[in-house]
Amino acid sequence: ACRAVSDIMCNGILPSSLEFMEKDAVLFVRDQNYADLPFKIEEKTESYLLIELDGSNKEQLFNEAEKIYTLIQKYACGKVIVADNKTEQERIWKVRRSIGLAVKAFSVYKEEDTVVPRANLVKLLEGVKLIGATYNFKSICYGHAGDGNLHVNILKDGLTHYQWDVVLNKAIREIFELCVKLGGTISGEHGIGFIQKKFIDLDS
């Protein structure tokens, strides 16, 4: 899904919303009973894009939708759901809005707010998962893909206090180092807060 984001934007289409949700994020919403999924989760599916178009010219909107459909077929796209009424739109948006709540209900977590050029979203996501495997933590990732923004929710789950309070800082620094290396920033969409101040040297 991340690979399709840059392609969509580079073809002159500017969705009003372009959201990324990895499969585990959607599973959390379902398993924590925060939303009834308006689609079936396929075993081979790895992630989802929520694409919203806006405008007053119906013909132009249909043309853009068809163009997007054609573009995403290059990326092993599965079933495409078209939400053409308010009820269906709200059902899909509820899944996206419920991810943070579902994560919070499951475990103590740390949310790292990252942003990179859209073309590097795939490398960022792959890097986050590799760092997670190295430091033995699970992450739930989602975000505003159209802006290159990725929320990385790191779950405490089975980590010891030492791993959570000490070792994880090394992992988070590696995530932010990767962001900067990929041409991004550690400030994401929310700026640099108290928690991220210790990593501010990476953004200089």
Region locations from a protein language model:
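Noncatalytic alpha-helical scaffold of FAD-dependent oxidoreductases
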Residues: 1-204
